[in-house]
């Protein structure tokens, strides 16, 4: 799928070397179709890495997407230059009068904090409330999923005894579900987190469907029945070496991390790590764009505000 982004974005050159179709405004203007508007709230510290990971997967279906990046104005990034943020990102006040067909909320390295102690929490809360009437389908990832469940349903996150890090199997639970079209009965994906949610709380506090789970990871992906909200606790978007970089970063910082499970051959960190989830990732993101966004979003964006949804409320 062609994605329309600022041609100066550093990710563009990387994507073009991978034969991924990106277009600028001039070329996009000659396509006589309405593009889908996708907003990405990027809360990850390595902004450019996450941009490339997500754009790589969003460029996987034959639909034109207009991508906007959003950042929390109440938080100052320590790892990405302010020039990059000012050039390629928008603030919430700049987008709050717009409508979007889809939104992705990434993870964030703030699991150790209570939600209310995150410095951008109030801004995040306002943005999530706004999304109910201005975004058709929202895909929450990792901490973004935990935060969304907490704000909307009061589902808590719980500290795990040790970090969950590695490539883990999950079973698909709803045969024929649109988000898992083309999937086998089971698949693997990266997980990297210190906290988890309670399946019992999800069942007792929400009307969300649990779509996949695994023995090590617990609940992995759940969604409202109308696919207006989707929660994924893994990282299908990760590159081959993302978990390795996290491991070496933590090791060099003196944290004595566990070697990511099912990742390095024979647990030898000098080996090239496996890549065994890319086809599942491609399918998942394509299914989200095609079935949750493209086939359901109204042609007139303003009707999103009038399109009432029960979401996952009981």
Curated annotation (Swiss-Prot):
Source organism superkingdom: Bacteria
Principal EC category: transferase
Site (Important for substrate specificity): 192
Cysteine disulfide links: none
Transmembrane segments: none
The protein's Enzyme Commission number: 2.3.1.31
Recorded GO CC terms: cytoplasm
Any one GO biological process: L-methionine biosynthetic process from homoserine via O-succinyl-L-homoserine and cystathionine
Alphabetized HAMAP family for the sequence: MetA_acyltransf
Protein name in the entry: Homoserine O-acetyltransferase
Record organism: Streptococcus pneumoniae serotype 4 (strain ATCC BAA-334 / TIGR4)
Lineage: Bacteria, Bacillati, Bacillota, Bacilli, Lactobacillales
């Amino acid at each position: 799928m062609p994605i329309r982004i600022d041609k100066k974005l550093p990710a563009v050159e990387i994507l073009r070397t991978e034969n991924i179709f990106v277009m600028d405004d001039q070329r996009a203007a000659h396509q006589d179709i309405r593009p889908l508007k996708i907003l990405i709230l990027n809360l990850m510290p390595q902004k450019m890495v996450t941009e490339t990971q997500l754009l790589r997967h969003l460029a996987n279906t034959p639909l034109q997407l207009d991508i906007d990046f959003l950042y929390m104005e109440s938080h100052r990034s320590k790892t990405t230059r302010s020039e990059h943020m000012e050039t390629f990102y928008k603030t919430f006040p700049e987008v709050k009068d717009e409508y979007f067909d889809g939104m992705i909320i990434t993870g964030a390295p703030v699991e150790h904090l209570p939600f209310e102690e995150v410095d951008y929490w109030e801004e995040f809360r306002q943005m999530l409330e706004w999304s109910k009437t201005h975004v058709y389908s929202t895909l929450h990832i990792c901490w973004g999923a935990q935060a969304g469940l907490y704000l909307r349903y009061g589902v808590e996150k719980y500290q795990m005894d040790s970090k969950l890090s590695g490539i883990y199997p999950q079973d698909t639970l709803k045969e024929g579900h649109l988000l898992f079209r083309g999937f086998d009965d089971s698949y693997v994906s990266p997980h990297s987190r210190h906290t988890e949610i309670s399946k019992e709380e999800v069942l007792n506090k929400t009307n969300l469907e649990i779509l996949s789970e695994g023995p090590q990871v617990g609940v992995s992906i759940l969604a409202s029945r109308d696919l207006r909200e989707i929660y994924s606790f893994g990282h299908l978007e990760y590159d081959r070496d993302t978990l390795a970089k996290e491991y070496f970063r933590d090791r060099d910082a003196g944290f004595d991390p566990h070697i990511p499970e099912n990742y390095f051959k024979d647990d030898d960190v000098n080996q090239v790590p496996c890549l065994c989830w890319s086809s599942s990732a491609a399918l998942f993101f394509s299914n989200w764009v095609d079935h949750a966004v493209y086939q359901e979003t109204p042609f007139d964006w303003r009707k999103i505000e009038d399109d009432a949804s029960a979401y996952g409320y009981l």
